[in-house]
């Protein structure tokens, strides 16, 4: 297994697919990186030379990935909560942030339904 950006990349997969295992690198960005480095997209990770791996590592350091990206996202959410923005309030309450309706669905964000004590017979 090759180690890039602190992540063990599976060696039996194609390079394009294996790069998407890194948080912050999607399909489009992995294609772009491989085109810039002139690396064949269909080659397996185990068949990469050490020179190609080092070029990949140096190219990926240019992008905001893994821990830095996760930290940036959490700080952005924390900032929204501190300034009292509407999105921050939704994050704080654990509700959908992007304008979805909550009357029916949104159970993945809200959690399991809580039982309400009914009227006694």
UniProtKB/Swiss-Prot annotation:
Recorded superkingdom: Bacteria
Annotated region (Disordered), positions in chain: 94-121
The entry's keywords: Ribonucleoprotein, Ribosomal protein, RNA-binding, rRNA-binding, tRNA-binding
Entries under InterPro entries matching the protein: Rbsml_uS13_C (IPR027437), Ribosomal_uS13 (IPR001892), Ribosomal_uS13-like_H2TH (IPR010979), Ribosomal_uS13_bac-type (IPR019980), Ribosomal_uS13_CS (IPR018269)
This protein's record includes keyword RNA-binding: yes
Protein name per its UniProtKB record: Small ribosomal subunit protein uS13
Keyword rRNA-binding: yes
Gene this chain is encoded by: rpsM
Bias (Basic residues) ranges: 109-121
Quaternary assembly: Part of the 30S ribosomal subunit. Forms a loose heterodimer with protein S19. Forms two bridges to the 50S subunit in the 70S ribosome.
